[in-house]
Amino acid sequence: MQLREDLTPKQIVEELDKYIVGQKEAKKAVAIALRNRWRRHKLPEDLRDEVIPKNILMIGPTGVGKTEIARRLASLVGAPFIKVEATKFTEVGYVGRDVESIIRELAEASFKMVKAEKMEKVREKAKEIAEEKILDYLVPMRVKRYGTLETFEEETSPAREKFRQMLRNGELDERTVEIDVEEKGVSVVGGVIAPGLEDIENQLKDLFSSLAPTKRKRRKMTVREAMRVLEQQEAEKLIDMDEVASEAVYRAENFGIVFIDEIDKVAGKSTGSSPDVSREGVQRDLLPIVEGTTVSTKYGPVKTDHILFIAAGAFHLSKPSDLIPELQGRFPIRVELQPLTKDDFVKILTQPKNALIKQYKALMATEGVDIEFTDDAIEAIAEIAEQVNEKTENIGARRLHTILERIMEDYSFEAPDLKGQHIIIDEKVIRSKLGDIIQSEDLTRYIL
């Protein structure tokens, strides 16, 4: 995916509207933050370094679209993106993940993205080389009496071309061939590191794998699989990994987006007592990363000055002012996301590109079953979702997944026997499947 930094704020919001219902304020904030990056790149170099991104703090209950907005935003512009949970990190000196691993993960995501792009560019060339190698296995070159190679073009060319055509038509896909596959040395580190020290384990694995020589192993596989393996091998040979690493670091530094979820869980609760030392320690460790520092990664040092950080939390038991003042100041843009209503649920079920109703219809269509939800059924599902969220924990749009799974359970199980049928799901069906559960609060808690 190529970087698309030239999108206007309106275009960004329009794209986000295709997947996320409501939350206009949050969409507007991230759209402006993204456009400001494009504006920064248009500035003279001496001024460019002075402009830092305005990090965003999203406040709102679970299931209202906080994570989805950040993920879709990154996907939209082709930027390196990672989501981390603040609760997974501990203060330096305690067992747990080190906050610098956030940037290492971002660099890794950036590297994979750039590598995939570069490999796509050389895909055709790699395919040609892989094809020739497969043909070498299928139509081997003749050997002279004294052991030297000779191609005998006038004899082998017609046969080779015939096999080439058959290969391209897929006629040889199931034939078995033996090919030489490159294999890295087996890691000797796995499973010996204590929990919480995964970063050290990964670094040791990388070190040992780089020291281990590349082995060639002869493997038997189908022509289809051999083409895929050889194409991958050849594509990796055609790209310059140093160039990929350099580009990955540049993108992580200038276009990276880090989404820190559950930031409220490391905020000191307003109990009047002193804040939890470990929680405050995580905040203090996060501070230099968000402020701007340099983190060593296996692809090179990554400066965090221009990475966009989006933090999110429900803040049920704490409030943003419970965060340490220094960290509060690093998230100048505050956006409150609204709880979802019945009308929002109706839209979520039908309007987005990836709407749940569309997903279930497509899944059942693979079995030859045509499912249709009536308007009153959709209204009933939305109403039930709102009721259950009010009665129990409010988990937002995620409640729809639970309810729909319950409704579709029998149809999904019997789908192979329902082939060719047109099934209409109306309000009566919804009420009959969920009525008893909704009336009993105990059942609601456990089943929906």
UniProtKB/Swiss-Prot annotation:
One GO process term, biological-process aspect: proteolysis involved in protein catabolic process
GO CC list: HslUV protease complex
Keyword Cytoplasm assigned: yes
GO molecular function terms noted in the UniProt entry: ATP binding; ATP hydrolysis activity; peptidase activity; proteasome-activating activity
SMART domains recorded: AAA (SM00382), ClpB_D2-small (SM01086)
Keywords recorded for this protein, A-Z: ATP-binding, Chaperone, Cytoplasm, Nucleotide-binding
Any Pfam family matching the protein: AAA
Binding residues for ATP: 21, 63-68, 261, 326, 398
Compartments where found: Cytoplasm
Keyword Nucleotide-binding attached: yes
Function, as annotated: ATPase subunit of a proteasome-like degradation complex; this subunit has chaperone activity. The binding of ATP and its subsequent hydrolysis by HslU are essential for unfolding of protein substrates subsequently hydrolyzed by HslV. HslU recognizes the N-terminal part of its protein substrates and unfolds these before they are guided to HslV for hydrolysis.
Subunit structure, as described in the record: A double ring-shaped homohexamer of HslV is capped on each side by a ring-shaped HslU homohexamer. The assembly of the HslU/HslV complex is dependent on binding of ATP.
Family in the record: Belongs to the ClpX chaperone family. HslU subfamily.
Protein name: ATP-dependent protease ATPase subunit HslU
Name of the gene encoding the protein in the UniProt record: hslU
